[in-house]
């Protein structure tokens, strides 16, 4: 079983599921290619349990992202991606690629907080996030002391970046920057409580 022709929109994705020499059109009400991989695993488990493709694929439409894991909300004319449950270099890359793959009539903004508990590699790993930001966003708003390393890397490449260790100040900057049609991704370690910034976007 495999997926081909994955197409992401602002709040869902379609793909072709290939199984047993047949091709099926499938749809998920969430974005992020990792959800497609999860759907393929669920499909395989369903087949193993004796279900048919025709029974399994329509059930994909009932899939929901839980809690603060890549939950997409409309706030007026702005799309918010809430992914504030945790953060690691790998999950940062994944979430930023979701942002990059979304259709957008405005600009794409990455609002990112520190990745905590990375130890002596923290500065290097935070700086490394800059590469994924420049590929997938138009601007970055960074919160926390460790994100200063990412800010420096972005500034060296001439990328538009705002950074603060003051959450209220960064929130005010973000709210004055956002305009209709924009998409904003909010992600950081649980302890950074990035949802507190997202809550101010209305």
Name each model feature, range by range.
Residues 10-11, 20-27, 31-34, 40-202:
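ATP-dependent carboxylate-amine ligase
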